[in-house]
Amino acid sequence: MNVENAIAYVQARGNAIERARLGAILWNEPPPDAVLQDLAAHQKPDGGFGYWAREVSNICDTAFVLQWCDDLKLYRGPIPDPACRFLLDRQQKDGGWDEVEAIRALNLPEWMMPGRIETRVWLTAYCAHVLIRFGRAEKEGTRCPTDFLLAHCDETGRLVGYLRATWIALSMLALYPGWDSEPFRKAVAVVEASYSPDWEGSYLAWLLRCLQDAGLPVDHPLVARCLADLERNQQRDGSWESEDGERYAASATVEALRVLRGYGRI
């Protein structure tokens, strides 16, 4: 693995937000004012964001941008506070989330389509994970997101729908019912059994981010295996591949460097 090449790739190919995320992750640099202004300009009046669906504030994109704020170490302030409130205000009484109805009118992937249990499960795991990072796991008066998640998993511990939902949920399951609970152990075992070393770098980095945020140590077998495969999958130009295509390689590289730094590999 070549850290210098990875840094050079992001600095040469990344946009201002990606470069700012890199600086915050590796050198604890505060984000430039221009980056904060850019984020604020894209935030909608209701506090939400549109990224894949720029026309409308939505759950997926707001959680996505909050993960950038996590990278930038922006946990309070005029950008993350309204974004967290946007998510909390749309948590449903059963503890879960669904995508906003306005998404239906847009030509978007099925994993963003509201009303599908597969969408609800992975978005619930995603929102819970992100909000935990900001110290706001659930809205007062609703059920715990874990209640919704455990109502939609099979006997092995795998959540309904996309495999990634199970590993994204690990942070919530680690918080409640707890790191030593059966649901948490089963979810980790599901991911271990389904793991592929051939996943794209961004997918491996996403998994590692969830494992780290859930508290799995560097010597855990799944963590160790995933770190080794992530390092091996670095491209010759220093980047890591994204499952969303070459356009997102700089962001994937930032995500890889984040987990490598978090686990003490760089």
PLM feature spans:
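Preference for long, amphipathic alpha-helical scaffolds in soluble/luminal domains
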Residues: 1-266
